[in-house]
Amino acid sequence: MGIGACALARSPVKIKTFGLGSCVVITLYDRQERIGGLVHTMLPSISDARIKDKPFKYTDSGIEHLATEILREGSPRKRFEAKLVGGAHMFENRNLNIGERNIKYAKNTLEKFEIPIISEDTGKNYGRTITLDTSTGDLLIRTILRADKII
């Protein structure tokens, strides 16, 4: 799954996304129904976009759309758990820290929707590959020159 995309699945499916640098992946998961999804966002807010036809490209609208899709599947919002990954500082320009802004917008949007963040692996200066296991809600995080991590 690529940048600006969203996927939703029930157990036992695994959803994988590559090339996570300053982008942020937000997962939402319902343990009771064993349904989850992730959105791979590139920019903080759709309000900054001139053309608003790609909601999954933006952190705020991506979270909103993913939550709506899980609600349509019958999961109540009170059972959602969120995890955040990414938001790395990939560029030298300190004024252009898109990753940090993506993390901030993700946290603010999840707080607005009263969805708890139960785990995160954010920031730093390296890329990540993520796999969501819808059987457990676990996120496998792979990075170059670092051990695999499960959150």
From Swiss-Prot:
<dbReference type="InterPro" id="IPR011324">
    <property type="entry name" value="Cytotoxic_necrot_fac-like_cat"/>
</dbReference>
<dbReference type="InterPro" id="IPR038592">
    <property type="entry name" value="CheD-like_sf"/>
</dbReference>
<comment type="similarity">
    <text>Belongs to the CheD family.</text>
</comment>
<dbReference type="InterPro" id="IPR005659">
    <property type="entry name" value="Chemorcpt_Glu_NH3ase_CheD"/>
</dbReference>
<keyword id="KW-0378">Hydrolase</keyword>
<protein>
    <recommendedName>
        <fullName>Probable chemoreceptor glutamine deamidase CheD</fullName>
        <ecNumber>3.5.1.44</ecNumber>
    </recommendedName>
</protein>
<dbReference type="GO" id="GO:0050568">
    <property type="term" value="F:protein-glutamine glutaminase activity"/>
</dbReference>
<dbReference type="Pfam" id="PF03975">
    <property type="entry name" value="CheD"/>
</dbReference>
<comment type="function">
    <text>Probably deamidates glutamine residues to glutamate on methyl-accepting chemotaxis receptors (MCPs), playing an important role in chemotaxis.</text>
</comment>
<dbReference type="GO" id="GO:0006935">
    <property type="term" value="P:chemotaxis"/>
</dbReference>
<keyword id="KW-0145">Chemotaxis</keyword>
